[in-house]
Structures are given as C-alpha cells and as structure tokens.
Amino acid sequence: MTTDASPPLQRAESLRAFKIRAVIVHLACLGVFFVPLTSTVLWTAVALYFVRVFSWEAGSHRYFSHRSFKTSRTFQFILALLAALSGQRGVIWWATHHRAHHKYSDVSPLDQHSPRFHSLWHAHFGWLLSQRALDTDLTQARDLARFPELVWLNKYHYLFPLGLLIATFCVGQYTAFFGATGLGASAVVWTFFVSMVLSQQAAFLLNTGLHGVEPGWFRYRRFATQDATTNAWLLAIPILGGAFHNNHHRYMNSARSGFYWYELDLTYLVLKILSWLRVVWDLVPVPQDVLDEGRKSKGHALPGNP
C-alpha cells in the first residue's frame, strides 16, 4: 500500500540535536588511541566501510536519487535501512538534496555542494548546519514519499545507528566474535565510529574533491558538462566507482559511473551480480552516443566561472 497523505515538510530532528551528534561521532574516533585493536576488529571495520559506501552509492544515490535500476519493495526498504544504518540519514532527504544538486550543479548558489559558489567548508559539510537543510521537502520526491515505510524511516533514521551502536558493543563485549570477549569499546570505536565517519567523508569528498578542481595526474575530464566535475581513478576503489563523477554528470540516470571497462565501478559490478540473481533488474545502460562521445574526447578543461 502506498499513500499520498504525507505532510509536505518533514522535520526529523532539531539542528541542535544534529550538531551534538556530529560532534560526538567525530570525537569518538579519537578513541583509536585508547582502545586495543585486533586484526578481526580492523578487517570488520574495513568490510563495514565498504558496506556503508555501497549503501549510499547504490541505494541513496543510484537507486533513490536517479532510479537507475528497479527492485522489489522489500529490497528497496533494505537499501533504505542500510543507508540509515550508515549514518546517511533518510533516503528521501538524501534524494531531494541530490536532485537539487544536479539541477543547479556549479551554475547557481542553489547548489549547496558547489565549491564554486561556497567555501570548501560549506560545500563539504557546512551546508548541513541549518534547520532548512535537515528538513525534508517531501514534494521534491513524490515518487519516494508515496511509500509510508520510507517516510517513516526518513523521520526516525537516527534510531537505527543508535541500535547498531548498542548491538556492536554487546557483540564485542560479551561474545568472542572479534577474537575475545571484552572488546566492546574497540568494536564500537573502530567498526562503528571510524568506519562510519570515513564512509561519510567519502560521500562529502565527491562534492569538494571532484567539483571545481582542475584535471591533473589522477583527475581527468572526459565530457564538457556545464558543471565543473572531474573523474578521479585513484578514488575508484574507496568510493566503489562513484569517483567517475564527470561521467555521472554527463548521464546521471545510468546504473554505472565507470562507463568503460577500464573504469573500475565496483558498485555496478555488485548490481550486475544482483541482477543475475533477480534481486534488481532493468539496470539503465549508458547510451551508445554518450559512449561514442567519450571515446572521441581528448579531455576538457573546467568551464569558466558562471
């Protein structure tokens, strides 16, 4: 059952609560200097980092923002839940802001992520520090707001990371999952806080590291888009393919950001495997004319300042 009865503006939390939580989450990472580290804790943190990046790159970004593939309502909710567990807020909130980013990308101050119109701090994180930025205008994502479970998850997204934090501590403290009992603090610091913060910073880096920076030895600009985006092959693995940002802005509806075989897009690879299993389907391909355009390209400089 879907519904159109949701109020247009949804407030998930106060700005004060968000600021307090952001400070706590980042300060908690300093715990790495005070807790023991085992190989199991470290590798679990690494694995969960990639799960978190996949949750927002495949889920919040390619599916909820751009509808680049189809899936069942059940798996749709799983993607939304994973994104919430990763500290990426609700997927409706994520999609409304990201769609606005594409609409005004690097051509208007309405693109809150653009370092061309705002400071690096504002584009990276500062844009979040207003109540308006934290609220969700459900009218900007009516295709998602018709699902009551997504609207509910969007409002109460912060409860799920809290539950995961408690569960992580209990597993580390009272079981030998990480190699011994009594590792609750280590598990929380490394597999929850550090892993989460790094995955969040990876998302923020797309705004400040791949917009408005001239092409260089690890950045290139294949398409002459109106925005100031580049691709960064060096970040392909850490961001699971999302670093081919200029490609993405050339054709944002594609299920893949690495348009060519040599552009490693691990998110697309996982989606392809899921499509073979019929968990997802109808992955949107890159149009042939766009591929041909890219093959002929000798690279482009950034456009002039608007």
Where are these regions (language model features)?
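Non-catalytic, topology-defining segments of multipass membrane proteins
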Residues: M1-L205, G209, N253-P306
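Active-site-proximal inter-transmembrane loops
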Residues: D143-L150, G216-F244, Y251
